[in-house]
Regions:
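Ser/Thr-centric signal marking residues that sit
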Residues: 4, 45, 49, 131
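Local beta-strand/beta-hairpin segments that build beta-sheet-rich folds
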Residues: 18-19, 39-44, 84-86
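Glycine-rich, low-complexity segments
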Residues: 1-31
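Acidic/proline-rich low-complexity IDRs
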Residues: 2, 40-43, 94
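Glycine-rich, charged/polar anion/phosphate-binding loops
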Residues: 41-46, 116-118
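Terminal beta-strand-rich extracellular "head" domains
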Residues: 24-25, 31-36, 50-129, 133-171
């Protein structure tokens, strides 16, 4: 990593240098209601305090779970409560959707794991925290299970973990 001293006594990082990574890993198995508005996806939220000015943030989400009637369900990422890198058209626009792993509706024993990421350009200020969170919405109210399938009465049904990884990259 190339570092140079600047007049203010701070450090100037070369563009593209990874400055830090923060992670949330959750094993909590819980259901939630998905509505037509963005709702936080399980416990996938994290604040990061920038080490650099005007940094970029690579935000990666790995979600494990199952959604009742998963069609029309959209996953997105918010920064300080606002969706990032997606058309502002609202409901129906998505960075990702649940991955169908079965050829028919199966709201019982088939997880729909999803991975998605985006690189967010910011006007970050050193020391001023930014909060990222994974969010979910749908065209109608439905139930979503985090880190498990709907059914968990035997070891035949899958369980997993979910993760939010945020990497700050010097801008």
């Amino acid at each position: 990593m190339a570092l140079t001293k600047v007049n203010s006594g701070g450090i100037n990082f070369s563009t593209g240098t990874i400055l830090q990574t923060v992670i949330v890993l959750t094993t909590t198995q819980a259901s939630q209601t998905v509505t037509t508005s963005d709702t936080q996806l399980g416990l996938l939220t994290k604040a990061i305090t920038p080490l650099g000015a005007n940094s970029k943030f690579l935000v990666y989400v790995r979600w494990f779970g199952e959604v009742g009637s998963s069609h029309n369900v959209c996953f997105n990422i918010q920064m300080n409560g606002t969706r990032v890198n997606i058309n502002s058209g609202g409901r129906g626009y998505a960075l990702a959707m649940p991955l169908r792993t079965y050829d028919a509706v199966n709201d019982s024993s088939t997880p729909e794991p999803t991975n998605f990421q985006t690189l967010v350009s910011t006007s970050s200020v050193i020391g001023t925290a930014i909060t990222f969170r994974a969010v979910v919405d749908s065209n109608s109210s439905r139930t979503l299970w985090n880190n498990r399938c709907f059914a968990t009465t035997s070891t035949d049904y899958e369980r997993g973990t979910s993760e939010l990884i945020i990497t700050e990259v010097a801008g």
